Structures are given as structure tokens and as C-alpha cells.
Amino acid sequence: MVPDSIAREIVIDAPPERVWAIVTEAQHMVGWFSDEAEIDLRPGGAMLLTWHAHGTYRGRVETVEAPHTFAFRWLRREDAEGSTLVVMTLTPEGASTRLRVVESGFADLTWPEDERTRHADENRVGWGVELAELRAYAVR
């Protein structure tokens, strides 16, 4: 059975405004997430994320509520229908920020079940790695 969502949560030693910039601005996204990034930061805006080892993937911005909620739809395969929804929620916690990331919609992808399961498993591991990189980037 394909899990429908992944949830990860970390506390970052930086204020929400700094974390917001890191998760929404292309020049920061390349410091922790992808090798190249383009983002039109408005609902309906296009995203283009490139990893040299994995290719280029597109997305669409869904929610921009600075500095609290950023959400985007993410299509990981150019030849496949459907997308997952990534919602990043930032909450002040003293001088730090709690960042919660939920990626959902794996069960609704139109891919074969083994591919959906593998994709969810890879992203579960990937978000752990990427969020650790984000935390390190935020305090540089």
C-alpha cells in the first residue's frame, strides 16, 4: 500500500523571516535543496528545480503567506500525470523557527503502485537529508 504523505519537522536556529527566504528564494534554494532553481513566488507561479544527478522537475506555487506558509505542487516525472503537494509551515519558537514539511498525494499519482511506493520512500529519505542541509545553511 502506498503511503499518502510524508511529514518532517525540524527546529532551525534562525528567525522565521530568514527561514522564509531560504525556502522561497531561488538564490537560497540552491544552497540547500537543488543545484539550480527558478521560482515565480506567487500563487500559480512556475517553479523549475534542477538536480544535476536527477534532472529538471517543474512545480507550481500554490500558497504564499509570508513568513508562515509556502506550498507548491511538484511533478517529479515529465512523462507522468499528477503531482504531490508540498506544504511548508513556519512557526516562531523563541529566536528559532519550527519548520514542518508535509508532502502529500502519493496515493493519488497515476503511476504503478511499486513506482509510487518507491517515490514516497525516496522522498521520505530525501526530506530528512534536505532539511538537515537547510538547517546547516541557515546558520552560515
Language-model segment annotations:
Residues 4-12:
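Short amphipathic
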Residues 7-8, 18, 25-60, 67-69:
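Short beta-edge strand/loop motif at the mouth of beta-sheet-based domains
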Residues 38, 54-100, 104-107:
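Hydrophobic-ligand binding "helix-grip"
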Residues 105-140:
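A conserved amphipathic terminal alpha-helix motif
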